[in-house]
Amino acid sequence: MQNYKVTISYDGHYFEGFQTQNRPGSRTVQDELIKVVSKMAKTKIKVIGASRTDAGVHANGQVINFIFPFDLNEKAILMGMNSQLPTDILVKKVEKVPINFNARHSSHRKRYLYRVSTSKFIDPFKRFYTGHYFWNLDTNKIQEALPDLIGEHDFSSFAASGNQTATTIRTVTKAELKIFPKNNELLFTFEGNAFLYNQIRIMVGVLLEIGNGTRPVHDIIRLIKIKDRQQARFTAPASGLYLDEVYYESMD
């Protein structure tokens, strides 16, 4: 038996998320991967993902692992998977890892990107790959607000209703914004040990409202203190969110 760590990218638009839904007719990234790897192994294979991205969310660097019944070289796994996967999923890298490696539980940090299109009208070529926000924005206000997210906090106000995690305490280690005026785009980068369901999309929604002037610049501090999801209001669309990279202690 051999454990494989596989880095993949995918266009999330036509998927109902990464995780198997156990619902007739649903299409998920995990289902497509299981189908292909199980066919290669000639037996049902369990596929574990580092992040359970939501419907419409994309990935540049999702990591999965699976234990294969026999040892093949990395190129054979990569070529075998890419020759059978649908064209909206791509295997980028395959590595042999110890049997106890788990793509989800072995990770210690994740990086997500969020793309915002600020064009007056929705660009037909960006509509599935950015969140659209056409209201006026003062990006200096957003830049001033971003450091308020850094550190270990109770992010209850930034968790989707119905969140069932054992704790809402998370650590954000990076929160940055790059501006691309020629493309009418903003690019947010967030890194942390883990994120709550919809946390990044809610954080982006709050930051955009700060930039628009409908919230005070340091309203994030208040939201963290009051622990009230209803006060955070706007959730940015799934289309702008990308899982960019997953980090592992022994493989950085």
Curated annotation (Swiss-Prot):
The keyword Isomerase applies. CDD domains: PseudoU_synth_EcTruA. It catalyses: uridine(38/39/40) in tRNA = pseudouridine(38/39/40) in tRNA. Pfam families: PseudoU_synth_1 (PF01416). Keywords: Isomerase, tRNA processing. Substrate binds at residue 112. One of its GO terms (molecular function) is RNA binding. The active site is at 54 (nucleophile). It is an enzyme of class 5 (isomerase). GO terms for biological process: tRNA pseudouridine synthesis. The keyword tRNA processing applies. Its EC number is 5.4.99.12. SUPFAM superfamilies: Pseudouridine synthase. Homodimer. Belongs to the tRNA pseudouridine synthase TruA family. Formation of pseudouridine at positions 38, 39 and 40 in the anticodon stem and loop of transfer RNAs. This is tRNA pseudouridine synthase A. It comes from Oenococcus oeni (strain ATCC BAA-331 / PSU-1).
